[in-house]
Regions:
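Conserved alpha/beta-domain cores
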Residues: 99-353
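Acidic, glycine-rich flexible loop/linker segments
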Residues: 2-3, 8-135
């Protein structure tokens, strides 16, 4: 029950999302990649972390005073007074930077060339809403709904999901809330899904592929999302789309859900629906896909992974994983220029990590 630094062989996203931020000051893992979902969650939760470290770690450090310097990739065990003083100074400087950023709240986000952009937050559950409001985000650009599944040992019911989505929408008070449908697979695993082991899960049955092959799970989530959309500005986003045929199948299932809700006399909204652009296939098909949806969301982490043919979970490849690689930037440029087919007043493109 005391504040601590967790040292582990590895932490899965499902374990990371359940960490108590009031007690876990930091964590260090021997395995893992700085580009993994565990690393992304650490940043989202504002928990300093060292992931995939080559620093020797033994049971001998258990119970000792430690300092984790996530910025420089260092861990200090039983630090001397001089090191303590330096680290406290760095922590103070970091706090001052955060306070300076708070002074920017309420101002418009304008680029150097005068373009106004919207800055939205990414969240994994309703617990993240306090930080969203505190930092004056213009909305929620990505609600990773899969963490509602990862935090538990059984499937969340329609009612449980509905209440969470509704709470988020009402808390945001009319600001956009973009909820991504279930994106399980790769490094995000749930035992109760009973998924077969795969040699290359990043290329396997994940995200929309699971939803389309197990429509009963998908329909439960869609019912909750459409019901919640009656209480706020919710949009629905589908991950790992690679073809128009997938979108057509989604639309068929959505039509079934809306028909069922109508027949049952259950109120629901008409949320905008978009897709994730995460693969070269989606980039090359974007002109056709744009005719089917209201918006695109470019997921740069997976787009980088699939464009560069680099496993983002492999720490040995971290040096080669470059989201600023010219090929990745050209992929993004292809999607945001007018000829992509989505540039209009009604439709939009967003980018997230």
């Amino acid at each position: 029950e005391e504040p601590m630094i967790i040292v582990a062989d590895d932490l899965a996203p499902s374990e990371t999302v359940q960490l108590n931020k009031d007690l876990v000051l930091s964590f260090v893992t021997v395995h893992g990649s700085v580009n993994s979902h565990t690393a992304i969650l650490a940043r989202t939760m504002s928990i300093p972390a060292l992931i995939g470290t080559d620093i020797p770690l033994t049971d001998a450090i258990d119970g000792k005073l430690g300092i984790v310097d996530g910025r420089n990739g260092c861990i200090y065990v039983d630090p001397d007074e001089d090191t303590l003083s330096k680290m406290q100074q760095l922590k103070q400087e970091e706090q001052e930077k955060k306070e300076l950023l708070q002074t920017l709240k309420g101002r418009e986000n304008i680029t150097i060339d005068g373009k106004k952009i919207m800055l939205y937050a990414n969240i994994g559950n309703s617990k993240d809403l306090a930080a969203v409001l505190q930092n004056d985000a213009g909305g929620i650009g990505l609600f990773r709904s899969e963490f509602l599944y990862l935090e538990r040992e059984t499937f969340p019911t329609e009612e449980e999901q509905f209440q969470i989505y509704r709470t988020v929408a009402e808390t945001m008070a009319g600001k956009p809330v973009i909820i991504r449908t279930l994106d399980i697979g790769a490094d995000k695993k749930c035992d109760y899904f009973e998924m077969e082991p795969e040699e290359n899960p990043a290329m396997g049955c994940r995200a929309i592929r699971i939803c389309l092959t197990r429509p009963e799970i998908f329909k439960t989530q869609l019912r909750a999302l459409f019901r919640a959309s009656a209480f706020g500005n919710i949009s629905i986003m589908y991950p790992m789309i690679i073809s128009v045929e997938e979108v057509h199948r989604i639309k068929e299932i959505v039509a079934e859900v809306k028909q069922e809700l109508t027949e049952q006399g259950v109120a629901f909204g008409e949320p905008k629906q978009g897709i994730m652009i995460e693969t070269p296939a989606a980039v090359m098909m974007s002109a056709e896909l744009a005719k089917e949806v209201d918006f695109f969301s470019i997921g740069t982490n997976d787009l980088t992974q699939y464009t560069l043919a680099i496993d983002r979970q492999n720490p040995k490849l971290d040096a080669f994983y470059d989201p600023h690689h010219p090929a990745v930037l050209r992929m993004i440029q292809m999607r945001i220029r007018p000829e992509s087919g989505l540039a209009s007043a009604e439709n939009w493109v967003q980018i997230h990590r």
